[in-house]
Amino acid sequence: MPTINQLVRKGRLKLSCKKKVPALGKSNPQRRGVCTKVYTTTPRKPNSALRKVARVRISGYGEVTAYIPGEGHNLQEHSVVLIRGGRVKDLPGVRYHIIRGALDLRGVQNRKKARSKYGVKKSS
């Protein structure tokens, strides 16, 4: 335990909280990146599926794993994508989502409900 004199000289250290989405930094709601690998992975224990994910290289940070939401996609290696924060609960290490309908990733085909989340324009 520190003495009063030590506390006067040094003070106590503030505990810094861990960032949930470190690749986005403080001021960026989204970042652009390039896909290095597009693949499927299986979720954690009670669930079963083939979830579509991509490794994305972000300049000035490194590589992160991002989830591709919706049914079907046109992503390949070297596709340019926009990522946002938001984890996938049953995929360990996946803390980002790729935004549909932005840059190289098309919106979901034949989507009628919740269109804004999947980058689909209003059909007339």
Swiss-Prot record:
Q: Which gene encodes it?
A: rpsL
| Residue spans crossing the bilayer | none
Single GO MF annotation: structural constituent of ribosome
Q: Which protein are we looking at?
A: Small ribosomal subunit protein uS12
UniProt entry keywords in alphabetical sequence: Methylation, Ribonucleoprotein, Ribosomal protein, RNA-binding, rRNA-binding, tRNA-binding
An example Gene Ontology biological process: translation
Query: From which source organism is this entry?
Result: Wolbachia sp. subsp. Brugia malayi (strain TRS)
Tell me which residues bear 3-methylthioaspartic acid. 90
Q: Name one GO cellular component term.
A: small ribosomal subunit
